[in-house]
Every structure is written in C-alpha cells, then in structure tokens.
Regions:
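Acidic (Asp/Glu-rich) sequence patches and key acidic residues
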Residues: 1-134, 141-142
C-alpha cells in the first residue's frame, strides 16, 4: 500500500500572494496557502495529499499513468486533462463507498480532505493555465 501519495506544484520562484486568488466557483471557501517546502531547485507546494489510501493511489496510477503494480515513483502531470481525470477519480471515491478500500481512514474520516483536494485541483488547473511551463507531479512513496 502506498504510504505517502499526493500532488505537488514545483516552481523556481515563490508564488506571489496575488496568485492565491479565490476560485469563482468556490467563493465561500477560505484558501490557505499550500504547505511549501523550499529545496535547492525551487519551491514544492503540496496541492493534494493522501496517506495510505491505496484505492485512490491505484486508480490514479492505473488509469492515468498506465502503471500497474508500481513500486512507487514520481510521475509528471503534463497533459491538460490529467487534472480533471484525478478530480473524477476523487469524486468517484466520494460517491461510491463500495470503492473505498485498503485505507487506514474510513471514507467519513477522509471525505473532507478529498473534497479539499478536488477544490485545490481546480485552483491548480487555473494556475497552470495562467503560468505555462510549471511542473506538477504525482508522487508515490510505495
């Protein structure tokens, strides 16, 4: 089971606070700045994070990256529709409790985080459209 899985935005420069604009569809939701880690090659922003949710991990690896029985790794999200596909996977798991398996969390415990990830991915799509050439990865520490 993948221990740490998530999506990161990698930038050479720190994101200007003006870029943390509210998404029109979600005006009533407060956006905090994403967790940021600074490394020698830039800033890593945690857009989404799952811990020990292999049902989500497996769906993303199998359906988007054609990776079956993956031993982990870093996978670049470089096609425009991949963000929507990940959102669809998250929505599917929220709406289909029978699909929720192999996780240390119950769906009730995880649903708030999953919903926030869906919103964060909408922000990411908008950000990527305005900032061409940014790097986005799905990481899996299996």
């Amino acid at each position: 089971m993948g221990l740490e899985n998530g999506i990161q935005l990698i930038m050479k420069q720190k994101i200007d606070l003006d870029d943390w604009n509210i998404i029109p569809e979600y005006v009533h939701i407060e956006f905090d700045e994403f967790n940021t880690n600074e490394y020698k090659d830039g800033y890593y922003y945690d857009i989404c994070y799952w811990r020990k949710c292999s049902c989500i991990r497996d769906s993303i690896l199998n359906n988007i990256f054609n990776e079956y029985n993956s031993a982990g790794g870093i996978f670049e999200i470089d096609k425009p529709n991949q963000i929507e596909q990940i959102q669809d996977i998250l929505i599917y798991h929220l709406l289909n409790p029978e699909a929720w398996r192999s996780a240390i969390w119950t769906l009730d415990e995880a649903c708030r985080n999953i919903a926030q990830c869906i919103i964060n991915l909408t922000w990411l799509k908008n950000f990527m459209a305005e900032h061409l050439g940014v790097k986005v990865i799905f990481y899996d520490s299996f």
